[in-house]
Amino acid sequence: MKIVIINGSARKGNVLTAINAFAKGAAGDNDIEIIQPDKLHIAPCKGCGACQCYKGCVDQDDTNDTIDRIAAADMILFATPVYWWGMSAQLKQVIDKCYCRGMQLKGKKTGVIVVGGSPVENIQYELIRKQFECMADYLSWDMLFQKAYYATAKDDLAKDTTALEKLESLGRAVNN
């Protein structure tokens, strides 16, 4: 199975730790690719609608290549820190640009990992969860999981062996 992980964090901290734990569990026979939006040149969506006429974004940047890679996946894992009660701008920008070929994302297996600086009962996680549920409903995604983690210091998640084991287990579960 082809798994594309979109890392919405520009930092090498807790979100990357979560991604690596999931990827370790999913390794097996899966082809895993991590997309790092902060390393790409992707202009914000202008809402021009030209993509609907030209079968892709008309911006001369990394959008179409990135969307091709996402569309080719059997599973998409969205991973993000919480920024101001929502997903990171880096992840949101990639999601916004998926509009140009959104129907190619129908029926995908998906998962969501969110790491924030507040306890997981905080409303910020619920807001992000609900947004992904709406996307999943619209695009008929098979949402395999949504996991939220509370971590403030750079290595908090790396010290949480229970969370790391659960993330590896989630990775192994996608092989079934």
Question: Whereabouts are the PLM-identified features?
Answer:
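A short acidic, helix-capping loop that chelates divalent metal ions and anchors anionic groups
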Residues: 115-120, 151-157
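Acidic, low-complexity intrinsically disordered regions
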Residues: 80-81, 137
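N-terminal beta1-alpha1-beta2 submodule of the flavodoxin-like/Rossmannoid cofactor-binding fold
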Residues: 1-79, 85-101, 145-147, 157-176
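Short, glycine-/small-residue-rich phosphate/pyrophosphate-handling segment
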Residues: 106-146
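Short glycine-rich anion-binding loops that position phosphate/pyrophosphate groups of nucleotides
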Residues: 82-84, 117-118
